[in-house]
Design a protein with these regions (language model features):
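A short linear hydrophobic-aromatic micro-motif
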Residues: 22-25, 63-66, 200-202, 256
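Internal nucleotide-binding/catalytic subdomain
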Residues: 35-178
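Hydrophobic side chains in beta-strands
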Residues: 80, 157, 216-217, 248
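Short, intrinsically disordered, charge-balanced linker/junction segments flanking boundaries
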Residues: 255-261
């Protein structure tokens, strides 16, 4: 259940009328994965609405907000290749969003991921394909707006079954870092098939292995974080495991040193 608003007063009137907490408030636009607030009471909701809609923390993305009922259950990220008529899901993953250990702290763009998602069983995958993935692609076709590219399904496995939390028309970060290393098919071939509309004739195969991603973030993240701090321990000779890959974002080389940026 959800409602959208462009008036802060109407947001709070709706939340008070519903009277259910926690309640979820989302900036209806791009916010670097940080535009979702889970509010435990009316004061937190009021503070969140002010932050998003009045203080414009996320700029124009906060002109509208979505207020959603709070759902419980394991979260699942399923990236998929879609050529407008055929959808082929990639291996599932689980994103850990909280900044601190033990699922504590602020929501972030993601502090780590694992793939495959242990809660996403073959039975759940079949249900999602029938009830969510295929109907989504068919609906876009019916609106004469077929989608080609990476279609990202953000799901929650609730006691009432899988629910869609969000769609993204892009690869996920940090989900991609654990999903694509498990892809055994040639990525370029799959992407060409996605573009050409021939996914139904193209094999998309993933290994039976697993992958994990851990985010190393500068102090203060996801709020004001420290910049210019030296990062050590990431050179090839300093990494113990041969199968470790380091991906960079928000870093720079200054005076020959790797620093946060």
């Amino acid at each position: 259940k959800y409602e959208t608003f462009d008036d802060p007063a109407k947001v709070m009137a709706y939340i008070r009328a519903e009277g259910k907490y926690p309640v979820v408030i989302k900036a209806d636009g791009l916010a670097l994965g940080k535009g979702v607030l889970i509010c435990q009471n009316e004061q937190e909701a009021a503070d969140g609405v002010k932050e998003i809609m009045l203080d414009k923390k996320f700029g124009a993305s906060g002109n509208h907000v979505v207020v959603e009922e709070f759902l419980t259950g394991p979260e699942v990220s399923v990236l998929s290749f879609c050529d407008g008529k055929t959808v082929k899901p990639m291996v599932s993953s689980m994103d850990h969003k909280r900044a601190l250990d033990h699922d504590e702290g602020l929501n972030t763009g993601g502090m780590g991921t694992v793939a495959p998602n242990p809660y996403y069983t073959p039975a759940v995958a079949d249900r999602c394909m029938k009830e969510i993935f295929l109907p989504t692609v068919a609906a876009m076709q019916a609106e004469d707006c077929p989608f080609k590219g990476c279609l990202y399904f953000g799901l929650m496995l609730t006691p009432d079954g899988p629910k869609v939390i969000e769609y993204n028309c892009r690869f996920g970060d940090p989900e991609t870092q654990v999903v694509l290393p498990l892809l055994e098919s040639d990525l370029l071939t799959v992407m060409q098939a996605t573009t050409n509309g021939t996914l139904d004739k193209t094999e998309v195969k993933f290994s039976d292995g697993a992958a994990a991603c851990v985010i190393l973030a500068s102090g203060g993240y996801p709020l004001a974080y420290e910049k210019g701090k030296e990062i050590t321990g990431l050179t090839e000779g300093q990494l113990d495991a041969a199968d470790v890959t380091v991906y960079h974002a928000g870093t720079a080389i200054k005076e020959g040193k790797l620093v946060t940026n």
